[in-house]
């Protein structure tokens, strides 16, 4: 357990650079890399959250779940997501953000795969609640990243760019579903 906790911590400090142009070039490269990683990374989180929206009608038409059961399942995701955002926000401040988000996205992907093999209401409900928890590991680290890499004067612009990740995720979900 201790190894797992150490793995998720931030890394050691890198050696200091003294060449101003090298520092500026590296800083701008890293900033842009982090920004686009959190934009597309959080967009992919949305794919794992919206899959049930695409599957609701076929599941109801097939008699697998009714509207009430789907409502309960959806509510469970949002309750665990909300509680997870509260707790994971604190954890994200102290964690290696790349590993933190990757863990959340990886487990969410596994839960989404398992969702396809479930046929009972309680199976769907438990898996979707777990998905909500791990989905909550995306937003807080993304916000922390933007806050850490951009000045207070720049943040509004870059938060606006990050906000497009919702649309990217929705677009990819519906395009992917239409393709399949």
Sequence positions of predicted segments:
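Short hydrophobic/alpha-helical segments at membrane-entry points of transmembrane helices
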Residues: 120-128
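Cytoplasmic helix-loop-helix junction between adjacent transmembrane helices
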Residues: 127-164
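Extracellular/periplasmic helix-loop-helix junction of adjacent transmembrane segments
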Residues: 55-82
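Extracytoplasmic
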Residues: 33-61, 65
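Membrane-interface helix termini in secondary transporters
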Residues: 58, 89-90, 179
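Glycine-rich segments within core transmembrane alpha-helices of 12-TM secondary carriers
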Residues: 160-175
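Residue-level signature of mid-helix packing/kink "hotspots" within the transmembrane helices
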Residues: 50, 78-86, 170-171
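Conserved MFS/SLC helix-loop-helix module at the cytosolic interface between two early adjacent transmembrane helices
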Residues: 83-119
């Amino acid at each position: 357990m201790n190894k797992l906790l150490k793995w998720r911590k931030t890394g050691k400090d890198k050696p200091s650079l003294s060449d101003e142009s090298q520092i500026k070039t590296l800083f701008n490269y890293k900033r842009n890399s982090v920004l686009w990683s959190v934009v597309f990374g959080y967009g992919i989180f949305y794919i794992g959250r919206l899959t049930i929206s695409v599957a609701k009608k076929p599941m109801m038409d097939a008699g697998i779940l009714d509207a009430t059961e789907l409502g309960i399942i959806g509510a469970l995701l949002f309750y665990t997501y909300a509680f997870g955002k509260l707790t994971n926000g604190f954890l994200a401040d102290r964690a290696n953000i790349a590993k933190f988000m990757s863990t959340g996205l990886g487990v969410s992907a596994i839960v989404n795969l398992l969702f396809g093999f479930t046929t009972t209401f309680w199976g769907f409900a438990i898996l979707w609640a777990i998905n909500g928890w791990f989905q909550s590991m995306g937003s807080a680290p993304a916000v922390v990243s933007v806050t850490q890499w951009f000045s207070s004067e720049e943040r509004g612009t870059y938060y606006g760019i990050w906000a497009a990740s919702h649309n990217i995720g929705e677009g990819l979900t519906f395009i992917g579903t239409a393709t399949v």
